[in-house]
Amino acid sequence: MRNLVIALLMLAASPALAQDKEKLSATDLTVRTALTFKVSDTVVQKLLPAGFEVNSPTAGPSKGSNLNMTLIDYLMVQDPEGKPLPPRTTVAMSIPAKKTASGEAVAVVFGGFIAQAAIPGPYFVFGSAKLAVDRQSHTDADGKSIIDETWEVTADDGGALEVQLQFVRGVPARGKAEPKIHSAAKPEFYRIYRFEQAADVVRSTATGIDRVSKCSIKATGPKLALLFDGSEQLISITSIPFYSRSIYVPAI
């Protein structure tokens, strides 16, 4: 009985111990569009810091991809006390990876774009750019919803990114996760996302889903040309009309 009591006390204390090891950094609410690609493994591996290796999904709509581009339209951002922070449109570039020593699956953010006032961003890798997003939704009398999106990035280094999409909205799938995201510039630094989302996969080469009627991706400049040289393969497009996240960092 005594051992059982001790075990129960340890189990009850474990969430508190986890909380002691991390602290809330921010909460936010965003609308996202996530694109995944297959590019040269050699090129992608060179973007990862020592101790990490490419870990492409082996199942699901993004099966076989090794590059993530996440287009983020912030609706609301709050600090740990609930005070508002400036919402900034962001493009984040990351790689599905794993730690070589432990095999732990993580994501590594190696680049992206954000407004000049926010550089180098939370992962110390974002470049300064002017970003704009235009999104339109039309629902007909039969309930069919068509979404048009245009994302435009004009980077201060001369690079540019334009993504134009048109797709038929499906029924989003609700889900939640707690991924750990590392920085390529400071690989020992990471953030933990605890999020809930509604995700609508509108194109996937792995599953055969395709409700996209228009897709144009143009990428130029020193940071993008290495990845988008014409040989890249678009693996999936996921529309995420609802993404609610709490961000935690290790407690110092």
Task: Give a label for each model feature.
Residues M1-L4:
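Positively charged n-region of N-terminal signal peptides that target proteins for export
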Residues T42-L47, N66-D73, L85-P86, P122-K130, ...:
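Short linear motifs at secondary-structure transitions and domain/linker junctions
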Residues S128-I252:
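Interaction-surface and assembly-scaffold signal
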Residues N55-G60, A92, A117-A118, R174-K176:
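Short, surface-exposed linear patches
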Residues I6-L11:
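Hydrophobic alpha-helical targeting segments used for export or membrane insertion
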Residues Q19-Y74, T205, D210-K223, L227-S231, ...:
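N-terminal domain-onset segments
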Residues Y74-A155:
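Aromatic- and glycine-enriched beta-alpha-beta binding-site module
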Residues A13-P15:
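N-terminal signal peptide c-region/cleavage motif recognized by signal peptidases
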